From Swiss-Prot:
This is mRNA 3'-end-processing protein rna14. It comes from Schizosaccharomyces pombe (strain 972 / ATCC 24843) (Fission yeast). Keywords: Cytoplasm, mRNA processing, Nucleus, Repeat. One of its GO terms (molecular function) is mRNA binding. One of its GO terms (cellular component) is nucleus. InterPro entries: HAT (IPR003107), Rna14-like (IPR045243), Suf (IPR008847), TPR-like_helical_dom_sf (IPR011990). Residues 404-414 have a biased composition (Low complexity). Residues 1-45, 404-425 are annotated as: Disordered. Residues 27-45 have a biased composition (Polar residues). HAT repeats lie at residues 85-117, 119-150, 158-193, 204-237, 269-302, 312-344, 523-557. Transmembrane segments: none annotated. Component of the cleavage factor IA (CFIA) complex, which is involved in the endonucleolytic cleavage during polyadenylation-dependent pre-mRNA 3'-end formation. Pfam families: Suf. It comes from the Eukaryota.
């Protein structure tokens, strides 16, 4: 058992020792979290044997061995043993089932219920000690309360005290859950039903009931409205004179909790299901589910109950994280955010437990492992750094191997009799490419970590091991070469490593570009020129352009002019779509003026089109009347149609209004130059306050259609005094 398992076991022991009737046993077995992703439920992995048609148990075990995460096969096996009353086989099956599912509430509830059915209370208490504080599920904790009440009759004084302690234990742990309402109600009913043999005992009882009521009505739970009515009736039954005072004091927090309950109910409705607990599906529905879980956590972090960053707020946020970890444990973001949150509240122990648990559920997740390793290294704890990276590398290699196996099986399933190329669907090809890159980056991270903690010599040994690995990309060679250059200050070794990588990645543009840049940086012109001439024929022209440009820049700035001209002519042949002038200008970091002018012309045309629409169809700004009052702008018009057009622009600044007061003295539209009209300051200020376009996820609005609709709409004209000031005031109110 590793360190965080010991910590969790100790915490479980302390709480359960304080809870009634459950004593922690020294030899109690705890959940072995290293078996979370067990690859098999049997020790042997021999050839699959043929089963008889009536051998249902054997068939189910074969299915489980093929896919340990097949929860339906597990439950079919449980049902088979349960229907035949085979207690030991049933118990063994549940224990095997807990290896891949150590935190699934349903499994623990069913396992404990089966032991209760056989009246094995000792086994039940051991199971509760293993799971209770690790699995924060209302169903599991309700079962715990039922067990406590079952073994403690209400009539005895000590039993009542034990049950009271159990209820306090439960509501302190999961009382923030919106589904915990029935537990609060049961606790209140239990307290109110208790005997009181003296005035002092009666007062103690009333105070206890009041305290639980007041906690319940400030918690967003489903039955909060009923509890509020019950609390009101309770206070009035005790003392009408003080009832109004108590109720008035709690009314504001109750209203806030009720509003929060409604929001939380919408957020969590249908959320806690097992559809995404056992296997990643990489579907849109799964992404939506993950997003909903994140929305719940963000909602709790927004502090809707105005708890002011206290312990209660931290408990609520932590509980939301715990629920997400139970139901969507294969979502890496949950573990990363949980780790960051617990660190932010200075709870490093819980943060480490969270990220270690996440690494077991997501063994091939790059970010989780690197984040953990860097945290440990930053805190001078280096014992687990190497093993963390090595486990990540092994997990990524397994995933890549599984994808290769899929490709092999698809090629073998060819029906035309011809050997078929190993081929994966496009989305799996992309996934494999991403995994291979992460695999290489994991080696790079390990090399750097070992160099920092053990020295360059140890890092070289890691590189030697990495370049012999079955899956690799060019990043490994780049990382090792640059380490030698910067840390050993030996460009010769770095160049040798780069050259070694050329054997495998000489046709990879990114690798050649990096190698060429390095040779230029160390002023090795001879080898740089040789590399360029050797690599260019092996790379497709469309991918080689950055390499051409890099060498052209070097020749233009530091080489021979004739060589630069010759290379420019060579590029003109390779890239006929590029103009000779554009290639020439690129030597000086400039762009083709013709292309720039074309772009600027298009932008100016767009501005002119906008100004035409803003001016009601006329392509020029008219004469401006500068009257003292903003709303006393007189506009001479010769037709009712022009009056309507003027009304459409009435609230714009005068610089955009068409003034036609001079009648025939004004030149015709075609006689005036069409120039871009600057937007009014009030509009530019408004545009500055709008969010960036990339954050808008809703339907897009077509601006031109919107302007057309506004222009064509029959909007009644309202003359306002100081219209500009009115508009500004309306925006800020």
């Amino acid at each position: 058992m590793n360190s965080d398992d010991n910590v969790e076991a100790d915490a479980s022991s302390n709480i359960i020792k304080d809870s009634p009737k459950i004593k922690e046993q020294e030899n109690t077995s705890t959940v072995n979290e290293s078996d979370v992703l067990a690859t098999s439920t049997t020790a042997s992995s021999g050839v699959k044997r043929k089963r008889l048609p009536n051998d249902l148990v054997g068939q189910l075990r074969d299915k489980i061995q093929e896919n340990p995460n097949d929860i339906s096969s597990w439950y079919a096996l449980v049902e088979e043993y349960g229907s035949k009353g085979k207690h030991e086989e049933l118990r063994e099956t549940y224990e095997q089932m807990l290896r891949p599912f150590p935190y699934v509430p349903r499994v623990w509830v069913d396992y404990i219920s089966s032991e209760l059915a056989f009246n094995d209370f000792h086994a039940v208490e051991l199971l509760f000690s293993r799971c209770l504080v690790k699995v924060l599920s209302v169903d599991l904790w309700t079962l715990y309360l039922s067990y406590i009440r079952r073994i403690n009759p209400d009539g005895e004084g000590q039993s009542r005290s034990t049950i009271t302690q159990a209820y306090e234990f439960v509501i302190n742990t999961i009382g923030v859950d919106i589904l915990s309402g029935p537990i609060w109600s049961e606790f209140v009913d239990f307290l109110r039903s208790g005997p009181a043999n003296s005035t002092w005992e009666q007062q103690q009882k009333l105070d206890h009931v009041r305290r639980i009521y007041q906690r319940a009505i400030t918690t967003p739970i489903h039955n909060i409205e009923k509890l509020w009515r019950d609390y009101d009736a309770f206070e009035n039954s005790v003392n009408r004179a003080t009832a109004r005072k108590f109720v008035a004091e709690k009314s504001p927090v109750y209203m806030a909790a009720r509003a929060a309950m409604r929001e939380l109910s919408n957020l969590t409705e249908g959320l806690r299901v097992y559809d995404f607990t056992f296997e990643r599906k990489y579907t849109k529905v799964e992404r939506i589910a993950y997003s909903r879980w994140m929305n719940w956590i963000k909602w709790e972090q927004s502090d809707p109950l105005d708890l002011q960053h206290g312990t209660m707020l931290q408990n609520r946020i932590a509980y939301a994280f715990e629920q997400a970890m139970l139901y969507v444990p294969l979502c890496p973001q949950i573990w990363l955010d949980g780790f960051s949150y617990f660190l932010s509240i200075s709870d490093e122990q819980r943060a480490l437990q969270t990220i270690r648990r996440g690494m077991r559920y997501c063994p091939s997740n790059f970010v989780l492992h690197v984040r953990y390793a860097e945290h440990e290294e930053a805190n001078n704890r280096t014992s687990e750094i190497r093993s963390t990276y090595e486990s990540l590398i092994a997990a990524l290699a397994r995933e890549i191997s599984q994808l290769d196996s899929k490709a092999s099986s698809s090629s073998e399933s060819s029906t035309d009799g011809n050997p078929q190329e190993k081929k994966l669907p496009e989305h799996l090809v992309k996934r494999k490419s991403r995994l291979v890159r992460q695999y290489s980056l994991a080696w790079c991270c390990l090399i750097n970590a070992i160099r920092r903690t053990e020295g360059v010599k140890a890092a070289r040994a890691i590189f030697t091991k990495a370049r012999k690995a079955p899956y690799q990309s060019h990043e490994i060679y780049i990382a090792s070469a640059m380490m030698e250059h910067h840390c050993s200050r030996d460009p010769v070794i770095a160049s040798r490593i780069f050259e070694l990588g050329m054997r495998h990645f000489g046709d990879v543009p990114a690798y050649v570009y990096k190698y060429l840049s390095y040779l230029i940086a160390i002023n090795d012109e001879t080898n740089a020129r040789a590399l360029f001439e050797k690599a260019i024929p092996r790379i497709a022209a469309d991918e080689a352009k950055p390499i051409y440009q890099k060498w052209l820049d070097y020749e233009s700035n530091y080489g021979d002019l004739n060589a630069a001209i010759a290379l420019s002519q060579r590029m003109a042949v390779v890239y006929p779509q590029e103009s000779t002038q554009a290639i020439f200008l690129s030597r000086y970091g400039l762009k083709d003026d013709a292309e720039e002018e074309e772009r600027e012309t298009k932008e100016a045309e767009k501005i002119r089109e906008l100004s035409v629409r803003l001016n009601g169809g006329n392509g020029f700004p008219g004469h401006v009347h500068n009257n003292r009052e903003d709303d006393e702008v007189s506009i001479a018009s010769t037709s009712s149609k022009s009056n309507v057009e003027m009304e459409d622009t009435r609230l714009l600044p005068a610089s955009l209004e068409l003034a036609n007061t001079q009648g025939a003295s004004n030149p015709p539209t075609s006689a005036l130059p069409t120039v871009p009209v600057p937007l009014p300051s009030i509009i530019t200020e408004f545009l500055d306050e709008l969010p960036a376009p990339q954050v808008i996820t809703g339907p897009r609005i077509q601006p031109t259609k919107l302007i057309d609709h506004i222009i064509k709409s029959d909007i009644p004209f309202i003359r306002l005094r100081n219209a500009n000031a009115h508009l500004k005031r309306a925006r800020f109110n």
